[in-house]
Curated annotation (Swiss-Prot):
GO BP term, example: chaperone-mediated protein folding
PANTHER family, A to Z: TRIGGER FACTOR CHAPERONE AND PEPTIDYL-PROLYL CIS/TRANS ISOMERASE (PTHR30560), TRIGGER FACTOR-LIKE PROTEIN TIG, CHLOROPLASTIC (PTHR30560:SF3)
Catalytic activity field: [protein]-peptidylproline (omega=180) = [protein]-peptidylproline (omega=0)
Cellular compartment(s): Cytoplasm
Family the entry assigns: Belongs to the FKBP-type PPIase family. Tig subfamily.
Underlying gene: tig
Protein's UniProt name: Trigger factor
GO cellular component, one term: cytoplasm
NCBIfam families recorded: tig (TIGR00115)
Role description: Involved in protein export. Acts as a chaperone by maintaining the newly synthesized protein in an open conformation. Functions as a peptidyl-prolyl cis-trans isomerase.
Enzyme Commission designation: 5.2.1.8
Length: 435
């Protein structure tokens, strides 16, 4: 076997029967330009002749025993077609073995272009197909992560957490004789005023304060009577700035106004949530907030880890992978928007966002699975059960990543993948260099 570099992006490999020029394109596209030697085509032609001989019936001869000349006279075109098929299949298989390139299952394969196939000249044909992605090996020690400073729980966060407990036991009385004031509770609709208006909040009850409403909605509802509406432009979140934020027009409608009667903050309130004293309630709330702060730091570490994996270990993805996964995500996103039957005005922006998210998700999936394979990381049944408990605990908050009522085999696969991802990321965090 010989191996020779040719033009940029191309390489030639050969054996006794054929030469293969390999050209790699974007999205794992591979082109095989294959030249087969005459001797190999002669062998393929003889094989094709025997195959056709066994398939046909010629009066006066047993099947498979007819003279070759007679077969060629009557079925010469069939023999030639069978010969071409054999040369294509054999040449392609030999090329795969020589190059160690594997076609992608269910990937795009173009129809072969056959330039010629004769016993005198040999054969020359071109095949283009999607190959499996080549996943680079990850070296965990090459990852450099920064420790995030611990975040202190603020008094405002403690107050908001306590307010959430109070709201569970708040009673409401309608207000009908005045407009909205700060501190009231209201039921509101919020509609984004696109070409086709899109309702994003439907009759939701919230308090008119900083924790209940963003300032740009709060300033519009104060002074409105029940049934009245106001319009404005959305504004960015000052605490969490988004460089891609774009202001859009909206309409807010106050459906009803309520006075909220909150319970006293005492031991009786604590008992309603399964505790004994109000001091114990404060302690539990503080512990929960501290745990959430730690989880936020962990999420930042994971996000930084994922960014480094994408940056340090780039690789190409098959277009069919991207398209199929993007379409599934796009359909889900439009369904959540309630616009699966009509495309939103900013459809192209949404499609690009989904495509970028899809590519990132696929790259991370393959890199993490490569880490698992290289380091023999597996998940036990106990770890799958623990993942189920974690996901069930997240259901009330809406953060669970499983469909508990879905297909049982798919649920098992979801839990296994979540547990494996968790294990791989912990392994990488433990092995990375921290600064």
């Amino acid at each position: 076997m010989s191996n020779q570099e040719t033009e940029a992006g191309s390489k030639t490999i050969s054996n006794d029967n054929l030469n293969v020029q390999i050209t790699r394109g974007t999205h794992c596209q591979v082109k095989f330009d294959i030249t087969v030697k005459p001797e190999a085509v002669v062998a393929a032609y003889q094989k094709a002749l025997k195959t056709i001989n066994k398939e046909i019936n010629i009066p006066g001869f047993r099947k498979g025993k007819a003279p070759q000349q007679l077969i060629l006279e009557k079925y010469g075109s069939n023999v030639q077609k069978e010969c071409v098929d054999i040369v294509l299949q054999t040449g392609f298989n030999d090329a795969l073995q020589l190059t160690h390139i594997h076609p992608l299952k269910d990937g795009h394969i173009k129809r072969p272009i056959v330039h010629y196939c004769t016993q005198e000249k040999g054969a020359h044909f071109v095949l283009e197909f999607e190959a499996r992605p080549t996943i680079p090996s990850v070296q965990p020690q090459e990852l450099h992560l920064h420790h995030q400073a611990p975040v202190q729980v603020t008094d405002e966060e403690r107050k908001n957490a306590l307010d959430q407990v109070l709201l569970q036991f708040t009673t409401y009385q309608p207000i009908e004789d005045r407009p909205v004031q700060e501190g009231d509770f209201i039921n509101v609709d919020v509609t984004i005023l696109e070409e086709t208006p899109r309702l994003i909040i439907d009759n939701q009850r919230t308090q008119v304060n900083q924790s209940g409403l963003p300032s740009w909605i709060q300033e519009k509802v104060i002074g409105l009577n029940a049934g009245a509406s106001a319009e404005g432009m959305t504004q960015p979140n000052e605490k969490f700035p988004d460089p891609d934020f774009k202001s859009v027009p909206f309409r807010v409608t106050v459906k009803t106004i309520w006075q909220g009667n909150m319970p006293a903050i005492d031991d009786e309130l604590a008992k309603k949530v399964g505790l004994q004293t109000v001091d114990e309630l404060y302690q539990k709330l503080n512990e929960r907030l501290e745990q959430e702060a730690q989880e936020d730091i962990y999420k930042q570490h994971i996000h930084h880890l994922e960014d480094q994996l994408i940056e340090k270990y780039p690789f190409d993805l098959p277009l069919s992978y991207i398209e199929s996964n993007k379409q599934a995500r796009l359909d889900d996103y439009l369904k959540q928007l309630g616009q699966e039957s009509q495309l939103p005005q900013n459809y192209e922006e949404i499609e690009k966002m989904i495509e970028n998210s899809t590519i990132r998700g696929l790259q991370l999936y393959f890199l993490l699975r490569r880490v698992a394979a290289d380091n023999k990381l597996e998940v036990s049944e106990e770890e799958v059960s623990q993942e189920l408990s974690k996901q069930i605990a997240l259901i009330p908050s809406g953060k669970s990543q499983i469909d508990i009522y879905g297909d049982k085999s798919k649920l098992r696969e979801q839990l296994y993948n979540l547990a494996l991802d968790r294990k791989i990321k912990k392994f990488l965090l433990d092995q990375a260099q921290w600064v």
